[in-house]
Curated annotation (Swiss-Prot):
CDD domains: GIY-YIG_SegABCDEFG. Its cofactor is Mg(2+). The keyword Cell inner membrane does not apply. One of its GO terms (molecular function) is DNA binding. Its EC number is 3.1.-.-. Residues 7-90 form the GIY-YIG domain. Keywords: Endonuclease, Hydrolase, Magnesium, Nuclease. SMART domains: GIYc. To endonucleases of group I introns of fungi and phage. The keyword Hydrolase applies. InterPro entries: GIY-YIG_endonuc, GIY-YIG_endonuc_sf, NUMOD3. It comes from the Viruses. This is Putative endonuclease segC.
């Protein structure tokens, strides 16, 4: 039986020797000498500008689990930390550093309002057209799920993507593994937050 690679979970800091500006992040790896120097846009740009030799990395703490690692990052990389001019961090710490938006209650632009009877009727008619005997949005039911010849296969034009040092075969697979909406992740890839490989 093949031996599983041991995974290390750790919190680290990277410091610019010239400016003393820091970046705090987390990393999951089976190779402690993988040369990982952060995934943030600002830290990557700083390394390009000043050169890798102008930075040093310090492992702050190792953790037993990925959750404990992300929880520790969330405690340090707070909103105040991100806003500081002495840090390279651009996003709050925690699971992948994705910002969390709360649009419940008064923060929702439609809070306290309601659609008119006429608008509700229009919405009802429009949504009923999307469903029908042929299935959702006009697709035939016989081609859904396992009946589709491409079901479970990676699209031939799919590109691999690297997120937080992990290589995923496609954006769709990454979105599913990270529990992130596909469109959101695709937008982040297009915006340059993550690298695609051909």
């Amino acid at each position: 039986m093949p031996m599983q690679d041991h995974k290390y979970f750790y919190l680290y800091s990277i410091t610019n020797k010239t400016t003393e500006k820091i970046y705090v992040g987390v990393h999951k790896t089976s190779n402690l000498d993988d040369g990982y120097m952060g995934s943030g846009v600002a830290i990557k740009n700083a390394i390009k500008k000043y050169g890798i030799d102008n930075f040093y990395k310090h492992i702050i703490k190792f953790f037993e689990s990925e959750k404990a690692m992300y929880d520790a990052e969330a405690e340090i990389v707070t909103e105040e930390f991100v806003k500081s001019k002495k840090t390279y961090n651009m996003k709050l710490g925690g699971i992948g550093g994705f910002p969390k938006h709360n649009t419940a209650g008064a923060k929702n632009g439609f809070y306290g309002k309601s659609h008119s009877r006429e608008t509700r009727l229009k919405i009802s008619i429009k949504s009923s057209r999307k469903r029908g005997p042929r299935g959702p949005r006009g697709k035939t039911l016989k081609m859904c799920g396992a009946n589709n010849p491409r079901y479970g296969k990676i699209a031939p034009n799919a590109k691999s993507v690297i997120i937080n040092g992990v290589l995923y075969k496609s954006i769709k697979i990454a979105a599913k593994a990270l529990n992130i909406n596909y469109s959101t992740l695709k937008g982040r890839v297009k915006a340059g937050y993550y690298k695609c490989q051909d």
